A protein has these predicted regions:
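Membrane-interface junctions of multi-pass transporters
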Residues: 52-108, 234-247, 251-330
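Hydrophobic alpha-helical transmembrane segments in multi-pass integral membrane proteins
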Residues: 57-61, 121-130, 191-202, 255-269, ...
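Short helical (or helix-break) motifs at transmembrane helix termini and adjacent helical loops
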Residues: 87, 95, 123, 148-196, ...
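C-terminal ends of transmembrane helices
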Residues: 24-39, 87-105, 162-174, 226-240, ...
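Entry/N-cap segments of selected transmembrane alpha helices
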Residues: 6-8, 12-26, 71-75, 96-133, ...
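Flexible hinge motifs at transmembrane-helix junctions and intramembrane kinks/re-entrant loops
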Residues: 29-44, 258-272
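The feature identifies polytopic integral membrane transport proteins across all domains of life
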Residues: 41-47, 71-76, 104-115, 134-156, ...
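Interfacial loop-to-helix junctions that mark the boundaries of transmembrane helices
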Residues: 4-15, 65-81, 111, 137-153, ...
Length: 431
């Protein structure tokens, strides 16, 4: 409510706009750096965002950061940035639903989700076991054992929907088989991951009420999606969309934001709300919503980079000392193996050809932003400690940064046989 009252204060509104402009400039700098390093631009946005807070604090002190982004101003900026991400994901989820409507494809998606969820959970259990066996009290902390083990396992199993969505869009893979399979599986993992996260926090607090609350939130989201689908199929809604496409786009965006924020208020993630609305939007010749969806997604895409920067600013402003390189190395290796191997085997079991399965495996290792949110939840709840959070942050950034180069490497490797075969055929014809 304080954030909404802020919008009526002209000087504060100017402060919000200035802060938002500065954050978008930070995102632009991150994108430029990523292009120089031949990384997906979203990696640059996240890394620069992560470094922004610690750099400002180190150079100018915490008071300077608080003055530049006081609580009420930062809350409004974060809300605007989150709205951009929600609108951007509505378009991607709608595209995903249009391509993944068949039974066999959906079954394959579930196999990918299983492969990219269960093995990483097991590697997370192994990492937690290594911490316990090492008797590293700084990394272990004093949280209840079940809560600690489950939280580490969940942290290793995350795939970041927002970051993957940006990578797919930047590389033109949104409509590819690998891209749609990976994004659909990531949405399933996201839903399961948030339930497991709630369970871990509940175990840490000594109560399971939060789990039941999360199940209820998912049911609420499903009901909202069904209501949206029914409403958009009515004659009045179709007529409005055909006659006033801009008005229809504004109303569609408002509905998506309402459902997403309601899901977050109920303890889930706004990403799920956006995905549910995008999947619920009717498709086909009798449902003229494509133009409105495109407008909504483009508007969100302009603000989505700010979300990565805003979230990154809040993550690395605490103390993360006493982290051993052995712990960091174990987290990185186990993170790569669990997601990569599990994602590949799941894709092959789901009927995907080796070429698609390799790309799915690479994409499922995209953690990035969602991992940071989960780690922040584990740290703020007292279940995870600074040292293990830092190790998992390094793991998340490393595996995510590998996504772009590995996809490029796969493209080049698969082009070589084709080029070689063409050269041989040409030489034979000349002879």
């Amino acid at each position: 409510m304080e954030s909404l009252r802020l919008l009526g204060d002209a000087p504060r509104v100017a402060h919000v706009l200035a802060a938002l402009a500065a954050i978008l400039l930070i995102a632009l700098a991150g994108r430029s750096l990523a292009r120089v390093l031949r990384q997906p631009v979203v990696i640059g946005e996240i890394v620069v965002g992560l470094l922004s807070g610690p750099v400002v604090i180190a150079l100018f002190g915490r008071d300077t950061l608080d003055a530049a982004l006081p609580g009420p101003v930062f809350d409004v900026v974060k809300l605007i940035a989150q709205a951009g991400l929600v609108l951007f994901l509505v378009g991607l989820a709608h595209t995903l639903g249009a391509a993944d409507s068949g039974g066999p494809r959906r079954g394959g998606t579930l196999w990918v989700a299983t492969g990219a969820l269960v093995p990483p959970l097991l590697t997370g259990l192994l990492l937690a076991g290594l911490v316990l066996a090492s008797d590293d009290t700084a990394a272990r902390g004093d949280a209840p054992l079940p809560a600690f083990v489950l939280m580490v396992a969940v942290s290793m199993s995350i795939t970041a929907v927002p970051v993957m969505a940006r990578i797919l869009a930047d590389r033109g893979m949104t409509r590819s088989a690998a891209g749609q399979t990976a994004l659909a599986a990531a949405l399933v993992i996201d839903a399961v991951g948030w339930l497991l996260l709630t369970l871990a926090i509940s175990l840490g607090a000594g109560s399971l009420d939060g789990v039941l609350h999360s199940v209820g939130a998912l049911a609420f989201g499903a009901v909202c999606a069904l209501a949206v689908r029914h409403g958009l199929r009515t004659r009045a809604a179709r007529s409005l969309c055909a006659r006033l496409p801009r008005t229809a786009a504004v109303l569609l965006g408002a509905v998506a934001l309402a459902v997403a924020l309601a899901m977050e208020h109920l303890g889930m993630t706004a990403v799920l709300g956006a995905a549910l609305v995008g999947l619920a939007i009717p498709r086909g010749t009798d449902a003229p919503w494509e133009r409105a969806v495109t407008a909504v997604s483009r508007a969100g895409g302009a603000l989505a980079p700010a979300f990565f920067v805003v979230t990154g600013i809040t993550v690395l402003t605490g103390s993360f000392t006493d982290t051993s390189w052995r712990l960091i190395s174990a987290a990185v290796v186990l993170g790569c193996v669990g997601k990569g191997l599990g994602g590949y085997l799941g894709a092959r079991r789901g009927g995907r050809p080796p070429r698609t399965a390799r790309r799915v495996a690479v994409l499922m290792n995209t953690r990035g932003l969602t991992e940071l949110i989960v780690l922040q939840a584990g740290l703020s709840s007292g279940i995870l400690t600074g040292p293990i959070v830092l190790a998992l942050i390094v793991m998340a950034l490393t595996t995510t940064a590998m996504t772009g180069p590995l996809l490029t490497l796969l493209d080049r490797a698969e082009r070589r046989p084709t080029t070689a075969a063409y050269a041989v055929a040409t030489e034979s014809r000349v002879r």
